[in-house]
């Protein structure tokens, strides 16, 4: 009687194991760890996005042209609870990040990840920017901005066209986003500044004052001719003699001009030298 009562559960458990075991054994584990791009890019980690290197030359032996390569994004503390979806209908979307702690986005095909040397190319940096689509909240598999600092962990999952997963990579190391500061929390008191910064500020202030004084001096010299116009120098005629002018008070100028030499009043007449 006891064997008869426990026989159906054992059969159901055995059937579940037989169904799950081939799927787990057929899932290839690729020895690749996703990571932040090594390219020297500004803003490769922001408050809502981060840039991964593209997994080129990674899936060539595990993916066919009809397969899809998905990026799984999860909070680091929820990555161990993530279970690979068995069908396309079970793929978690972005809103589930806030409820379940994970979602899938950025579906790629193998031809979008060509295996080639990009160091000599003229195109842009080969990166996958997570959280870069600011207007996709209503679309499935949205790549919307990330809601918090994290940390986040990611992995790539290869799914067959029929749905079951075929291969996956390892989880990345925790990725922390930048966190902005509240303007009210920034201390602007000069006493908090370092000694070097105070010295630099003093030097710059002194230089600014010297430049201002030099500008004012140059402006004064340049425009002084407009404020005080120079008098034209008196021109001298060749052969002229300038000396003091003696004016007599008892002889009108008109009469003094007509008197012969030696007849000036008040002077004795010159003696005549004739016999």
Swiss-Prot record:
Expression is urothelium-specific. It is a single-pass type I membrane protein. One of its GO terms (biological process) is negative regulation of D-glucose import. It is found in: Cell membrane. Residues 1-26 form the signal peptide. It comes from the Eukaryota. The chain crosses the membrane at residues 197-217. Heterodimer with uroplakin-1B (UPK1B). Component of the asymmetric unit membrane (AUM); a highly specialized biomembrane elaborated by terminally differentiated urothelial cells. May play an important role in AUM-cytoskeleton interaction in terminally differentiated urothelial cells. It also contributes to the formation of urothelial glycocalyx which may play an important role in preventing bacterial adherence. Belongs to the uroplakin-3 family. This is Uroplakin-3b.
């Amino acid at each position: 009687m006891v064997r008869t009562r426990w026989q159906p559960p054992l059969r159901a458990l055995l059937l579940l194991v037989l169904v799950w075991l081939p799927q787990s054994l057929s899932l290839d584990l690729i020895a690749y760890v996703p990571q932040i791009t090594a390219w020297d890019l500004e803003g490769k980690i922001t408050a809502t996005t981060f840039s991964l290197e593209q997994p080129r030359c990674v899936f060539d032996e595990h993916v066919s042209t009809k397969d899809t390569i998905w990026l799984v994004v999860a909070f680091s503390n929820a990555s161990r609870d993530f279970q690979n979806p068995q069908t396309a209908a079970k793929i978690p979307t972005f809103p589930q990040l806030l409820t379940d702690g994970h979602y899938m986005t950025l579906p790629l095909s193998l031809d979008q990840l060509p295996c080639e040397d990009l160091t000599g190319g003229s195109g842009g940096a080969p990166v996958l920017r997570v959280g870069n689509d600011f207007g996709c909240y209503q679309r499935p598999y949205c790549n919307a901005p990330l809601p918090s600092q994290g940390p986040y962990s990611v992995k790539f999952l290869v799914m067959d066209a029929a749905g079951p997963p075929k291969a996956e990579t390892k989880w990345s190391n925790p990725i922390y986003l930048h966190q902005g500061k509240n303007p009210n929390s920034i201390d602007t008191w000069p006493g908090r500044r370092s000694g070097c910064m105070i010295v630099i500020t003093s030097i710059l202030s002194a230089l600014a004052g010297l430049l201002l004084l030099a500008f004012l001096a140059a402006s004064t010299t340049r425009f002084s001719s407009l404020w005080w116009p120079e008098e034209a120098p008196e021109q001298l005629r060749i052969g002229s003699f300038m000396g003091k002018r003696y004016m007599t008070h008892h002889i009108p100028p008109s009469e003094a001009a007509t008197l012969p030499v030696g007849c000036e009043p008040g002077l004795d007449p010159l003696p005549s030298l004739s016999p």
